[in-house]
């Protein structure tokens, strides 16, 4: 079920949401968090699909804000998605012009679920300081993606400088499988001093830097980053050089 509201207000959106929920037999009390997605015009569909997939495991209220021209007259349009692809979740898509093009606490707060955690996600850009952003200040978790920045390594470095508890970057999340497999591999091997760690990957991938830093800290060994220019390769090989020989883990199909 999808309802479209043109040139509307937060109050009218809430009223329509209540009417749809009553007609659909839906209760917001079953939702565990509010996910606020701050998307860019022309790139929002992929972010919405990802948010819906995530909400299948954690029923949520998803609020997607899409910025349009800030110089246009003030206008707020909304779509309310209930049921169907959203499953047990609900999604409110806001399109803002003029003053409504800026995602602020004043604009979003009236749509938040009461007494539930707030997660904010920037899928296409990296804010100057996530914890000081108008919505970042009220969120318990702030998710960025430094890989989307023009200079991912510099973006990651800056995020580290302004880090506050609750900040998360997807460059670290993408390393979950690598870290799990490497830890399991090292646990199975006899103890031997590590001479050096080499991490191969794209020179633009912040995950390469993060994994190298993590391994150097955990193994107390020097790290060499063997970076290349091809951004689409990402992280593809790790070699741990020990006194009793080398251990290598790599992505199949990539040399």
What residues fall within each predicted segment?
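Acidic, Ser/Thr-rich peripheral helices and adjacent loops at domain boundaries
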Residues: 77-84, 136-148, 239-253
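Internal, hydrophobic cores of structured domains that mediate oligomerization or house catalytic pockets
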Residues: 90-183
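C-terminal structured domains
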Residues: 15, 20-24, 212-214, 224-255
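ATP/pyrophosphate-binding catalytic subdomain of soluble kinases
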Residues: 170-225, 233-234
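Short, surface-exposed beta-strand/loop "edge" segments at domain boundaries and coil↔beta transitions
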Residues: 43-46, 205-206, 244-251
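An N-terminal, globular interaction/scaffold subdomain
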Residues: 1-120
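Short, solvent-exposed amphipathic alpha-helical segments in soluble enzyme
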Residues: 51-55, 108-110, 134-137, 212-218
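A generic structural motif
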Residues: 61-70, 121-123, 144-149, 222-232
């Amino acid at each position: 079920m999808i309802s479209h509201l043109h040139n509307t207000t937060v109050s009218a959106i809430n009223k329509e949401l209540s009417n749809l929920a009553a007609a659909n037999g839906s209760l917001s009390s079953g939702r565990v968090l509010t996910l606020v997605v701050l998307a860019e015009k022309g790139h929002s569909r992929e972010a919405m699909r990802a948010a819906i997939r995530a909400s299948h495991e954690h029923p949520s209220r998803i609020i997607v804000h899409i910025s349009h021209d800030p110089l246009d007259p003030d206008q707020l349009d909304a779509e309310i998605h209930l049921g169907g692809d959203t499953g047990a979740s609900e999604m409110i898509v806001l399109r803002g012009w003029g003053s409504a093009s800026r995602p602020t606490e004043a604009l979003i707060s009236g749509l938040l679920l009461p007494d539930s955690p707030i997660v904010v996600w920037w899928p296409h850009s990296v804010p100057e300081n996530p914890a000081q952003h108008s919505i970042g200040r009220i969120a318990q978790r702030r998710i960025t993606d430094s890989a989307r920045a023009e200079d991912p390594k510099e973006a990651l470095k800056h995020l580290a400088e302004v880090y506050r508890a609750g900040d998360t970057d997807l460059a670290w999340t993408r390393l979950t499988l690598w870290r799990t497999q490497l830890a399991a591999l090292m646990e199975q091997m006899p103890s031997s001093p590590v001479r050096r760690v080499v991490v191969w990957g794209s020179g633009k991938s912040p995950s390469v830097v993060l994994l190298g830093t993590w391994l150097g800290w955990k193994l107390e060994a020097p790290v060499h980053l063997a970076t290349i220019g091809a951004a689409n390769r990402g992280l593809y090989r790790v070699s741990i050089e020990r006194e009793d020989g080398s251990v290598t883990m790599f992505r199949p199909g990539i040399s």
